[in-house]
Amino acid sequence: MVNIIWVSLTVIGLVFAMCNGTLQDVNEAVFKGAKEAITISFGLMSVLVFWLGLMKIAEQSGLLDIFSRMCRPFISKLFPDIPPDHPAMGYILSNLMANFFGLGNAATPLGIKAMEQMKKLNGNRSEASRSMITFLAVNTSCITLIPTTVIAVRMAYSSKTPTDIVGPSILATLISGIGAIIIDRYFYYRRKKKGR
């Protein structure tokens, strides 16, 4: 479906440019956009490689395990349906740690694995379990300490102070994270009260 939308937008844009006489502008924009995409990609890759390397060092030194153990009691309360030693809990913690350090691209496969494990716990039903809904809410609004991708994009566009976004980002993600947990709990207890 998304492919159809993209192709439709492209075709409509090209037809409109031909009718409007601005096909030359479209041509220039395509090449300029391709150049920018390469520049931004290399900037993002370098920052991602750096932070993924730091995460690997933290993992091998045991720092990630210590941090995960510190977070486990809180995470266990968020996901009481999941046994503490279940693989889903490990994937959830790893996903949240990756998001916490602004590594959204690294967090995605961990999130998918967590969902697969929770689906197994749910008996492979098509309806999402309470834990799956909570994970989606928390994952979408996860608190981010270092917004790595945003910093990389700001660096690619020659920002003089690319890390100025850190403070506002922490505040915004803290508010959204707390808000997501409150809303998730509200609807959970409301549904529980109705007996569903």
Curated annotation (Swiss-Prot):
Disulfide bonds: none annotated. The chain crosses the membrane at residues 1-21, 37-57, 133-153, 163-183. InterPro entries: Gate_dom. It is a multi-pass membrane protein. Its main location: membrane. Keywords: Cell membrane, Membrane, Sporulation, Transmembrane, Transmembrane helix. Pfam families: Gate. Involved in spore core dehydration; might be involved in the transport of something into or out of the forespore or could be required for some modification of the cortex peptidoglycan structure. This is Spore maturation protein A. It comes from Bacillus subtilis (strain 168).
